[in-house]
A protein has these predicted regions:
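Membrane-proximal, lumen/periplasm-facing interface regions of secretory-pathway glyco-
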Residues: 311, 335-395, 404-419, 425-428, ...
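Membrane-interface alpha helices of multi-pass inner-membrane proteins
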Residues: 119-120, 152, 164-179, 214-216
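Transmembrane-helix motifs of polytopic, lipid-linked glycan transferases
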Residues: 90-111, 148-149
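Membrane-interface transmembrane helices that cradle and orient dolichyl/undecaprenyl
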Residues: 108-114, 149-164
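Extracytoplasmic catalytic/substrate-binding loops of multi-pass membrane glycan-assembly enzymes
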Residues: 38-52, 61-73, 82-87, 379
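Short acidic/glycine- and proline-prone juxtamembrane loop motifs at membrane-interface regions
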Residues: 128-142
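Transmembrane-lumen/periplasm boundary regions of multi-pass, lipid-linked membrane glycan transferases
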Residues: 185-285, 291, 295-303
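Short helix- or helix-capping micro-motifs
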Residues: 27-30, 119-127, 131, 172, ...
Length: 504
């Protein structure tokens, strides 16, 4: 590899124009393809997506487990095209179009347009992005605003004006309101200042700190909401406490990153971390590595400490990873390696597009109970139809369940036809629905209770009248299904505690 000094001038204008046009055309076409794929998808809303939709029906400055931006986005998309699965998910491909464009622009500013092209395409075709672009979760706006904040930071590092500080403040603030993981950006700023001369000089500019402080101020309404709600969001992380040191979860997390970022990007990133002090890396390379390091290090450490390390928790690390890995591989002239990375991503994208259209017919032999690989996101629409029909015929005034999964799904797929409550056994709320839809003895009755337990005897002494309505079974794939029992309950005795344990 040959060393390139920071601030190397971009290539000729014709090349810039050509590569910019190629990039925009490719990502625009892929965005349209993803939107078309959503139209033909047979996949139901995931429980998280359905929960975020419920939030959008009750706009606030905070919710049990997340800041509020995802709800506002869902509400906005609902005003445009309604509340179908396709419409709820439509913003995701658009946000990733924007994120990839921002990665392209940041890489072009730091290096050149060719690096920008490869970095932007690596972002757009990363398997994790292709997966995430099919669903509407908090990672979608988070990565967009992280990329925007990084572009503004790079512009300021290159001596940009106060206008870029305003962009940084807005991006950082909106990112915090998308997901608290945006706070890793602060660690990236500090770490970059230790390893890059340009980044160190930027730390001395008041405009940077004013921008970051302005972004933090944008989280004030959410902080006040948490204070008024007994810091419910902090309580949502109570499960992630120290149990016993383990290395299994962090190792699985690191292995998963090869699938999330792609084997070329993440493999190259690990090599760059290993040779961080190499003379072949310049200050800009190290600054980008500095932004990638905090999420990865924190999540690995948390995995060792608590045994919790989900594959998507370090997603912000990938934004600068796309840039620095592309820069190093372009400088080394490793075109086949770059192309192989994009080819891997394109194959993953194609499989997801096809899989979503045949999800209800897709099964993979040899995986045992997990052969129906879409079973987590199938059958919920059918459950909503069956429960709604049974509620009408039985004369139920409300529906109740005892798990978050069914509460989230029925709340969306019943579309307000009946109130849906959760009968939780926890003395303190453990999720959003525990907090806002708890089953109470003085609520509407009779109650259609949908449960995995088929024993009517469990309600003895809790309800005066119990009617066994039989079972409900919905397919969750070609070889799998979910089976529930339904009971009509009335005459609740007070106080109504948690649901009795299912008898053997």
């Amino acid at each position: 590899m040959t060393r390139t000094e920071p601030g190397t001038a971009p290539q000729a204008g014709a090349r810039l124009d050509r590569e910019t046009i190629v990039f925009v055309c490719v990502v625009a076409a892929l965005t349209v393809l993803r939107l078309v794929g959503q139209h033909f998808s047979v996949v139901d809303l995931d429980i998280e997506e359905a929960q975020y939709w419920d939030w959008s029906q009750h706009l606030a400055f905070g919710y049990f487990s997340k800041p509020p931006l995802i709800a506002w986005i869902n509400a906005a998309s609902g005003l445009v095209c309604g509340s179908t699965e396709e419409c709820i998910r439509a913003p995701a491909p658009l946000f990733y179009f924007g994120a990839s464009l921002l990665v392209f622009l940041a890489a072009k500013e730091l290096y050149d347009s060719r690096t920008g092209l490869w970095a932007g395409l690596a972002c757009m075709l990363a398997p994790g992005v292709s997966f995430s672009a099919r669903i509407m979760t908090t990672d979608v706006p988070l990565l967009f605003f992280w990329a925007l904040a990084l572009l503004a930071y790079v512009k300021l590092m290159r001596g940009g004006s106060w206008r870029w500080a305003i962009v940084l403040a807005l991006a950082f603030g909106l990112g915090l309101n998308a997901k608290y993981a945006m706070a890793y950006f602060l660690l990236g700023v500090l770490l970059a200042g230790l390893v890059s001369g340009d980044a160190r000089r930027l730390l001395k500019r008041p405009v940077l700190w004013l921008a970051l402080f302005g972004g933090i101020l944008m989280l004030t309404p959410n902080i006040l909401w948490n204070a008024q709600n007994h810091f419910a969001t902090a309580g949502a992380t109570a499960d992630y406490v120290h149990k016993a040191l383990t290395f299994e979860e962090p190792l699985e997390f690191l292995a998963a990153q090869f699938g999330v970022a792609g084997p070329i990007v993440f493999g190259t990133l690990l090599v760059l971390f290993a040779f961080f002090g190499s003379r072949n890396l310049n200050g800009d390379d190290r600054a980008m590595l500095a932004f990638a390091a905090p999420p990865l290090v924190v999540i690995v450490a948390n995995g060792v400490w608590s045994g919790a390390a989900n594959a998507n928790w370090a997603a912000p690390a990938l934004i600068s990873a796309f840039i620095v890995t592309a820069a190093v591989l372009v400088r080394a002239g490793m075109w086949r390696t770059l192309a192989a990375g994009l080819a891997f991503g394109a194959i993953a994208q194609g499989l997801l597009l096809v899989g979503d259209t045949v999800a209800d017919r897709l099964t993979v032999p040899g995986l045992g109970d997990n052969a129906d690989i879409y079973q987590r996101v199938l059958g919920w629409d059918d459950l909503g139809e069956d429960v709604g029909r049974l509620a009408v015929t039985s004369g139920a005034a409300a529906v109740a369940v005892e798990r978050r999964w069914e509460e989230s799904a029925l709340n969306y797929y019943l579309r307000g036809k009946l109130p849906v409550y959760i009968w939780s056994g926890s003395p303190q709320p453990t999720n959003h629905f525990d907090m806002v839809y708890p089953l109470a003895a003085d609520g509407p009755q009779p109650i259609l209770f949908v449960t995995l337990c088929d024993k009517a005897a469990r309600f003895d002494g809790v309800f005066d009248r119990v009617t066994d309505l039989g079972s409900l079974e919905v397919d969750s794939g070609p070889t799998s299904s979910r089976r529930y029992s339904a009971f009509l309950l009335s005459g609740a005795r007070r106080p109504l505690g948690g649901p009795p344990v299912c008898p053997n």
